[in-house]
């Protein structure tokens, strides 16, 4: 926490909903953003924005689709997931949102500039140093929240 407080004078904004916007609005030139947000910024007129994976490692993230066990229309939910995972449609979704697809066959349907983009599909040597955030439990999460709130107030 103490190290973070020393960095706070350099922090201009917190934006996790659309982290490309502070870059696009000229508010900041360095920051944390999801890779798909950088692709969106490039597509929206900021091709010079680049994405760098720290050599020490990066945080990995993935979105998932789930069907609650008591869901209505369970069959239709499965059909929808099957549909959007078809290579053609998975590629279309990736092209629209700038995030990669877990469907390897979809890459064959993508334009080469997307399928071969290391921002969208990081090389394996970078991923070996990346990690998923693990569940730290409610007690530690409450402590994180306490420090986070203090950092924002003291900003």
Model regions: which residues?
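Non-transmembrane alpha-helical segments in soluble domains
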Residues: 1, 5, 20, 24, ...
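Short, solvent-exposed loop/beta-turn-alpha elements that line the ligand-binding surface or hinge
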Residues: 1-6, 115-116, 132-134
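Ligand-binding pocket segment of bilobal, Venus flytrap-like solute-binding proteins
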Residues: 1-54
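Sec/Tat-exported extracytoplasmic proteins
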Residues: 8-11, 27, 42-45, 69, ...
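Short beta-strand->loop
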Residues: 47-59, 68-71
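Short amphipathic alpha-helical segments
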Residues: 63-65
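Mature extracytoplasmic/periplasmic domains
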Residues: 68-128
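Conserved C-terminal helix/tail region of periplasmic/extracytoplasmic solute-binding proteins
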Residues: 124-155
């Amino acid at each position: 926490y103490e190290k973070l407080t020393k960095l706070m004078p350099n922090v201009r904004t917190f934006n996790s909903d659309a982290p490309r916007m502070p870059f696009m609005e000229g508010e900041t030139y360095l920051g944390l953003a999801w890779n798909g947000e950088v692709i969106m910024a490039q597509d929206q007129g900021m091709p010079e924005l680049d994405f760098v994976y720290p050599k020490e490692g990066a945080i990995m993230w993935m979105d998932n689709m789930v069907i609650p066990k008591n869901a209505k229309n369970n069959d239709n939910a499965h059909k929808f997931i099957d549909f959007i995972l078809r290579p053609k449609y998975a590629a279309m979704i990736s092209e629209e949102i700038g995030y990669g697809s877990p469907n390897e066959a979809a890459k064959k349907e993508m334009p080469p500039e997307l399928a071969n983009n290391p921002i969208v599909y990081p090389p394996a040597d970078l991923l070996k140093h990346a990690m998923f955030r693990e569940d730290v439990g409610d007690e530690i999460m409450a402590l994180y929240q306490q420090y986070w709130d203090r950092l924002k107030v003291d900003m």
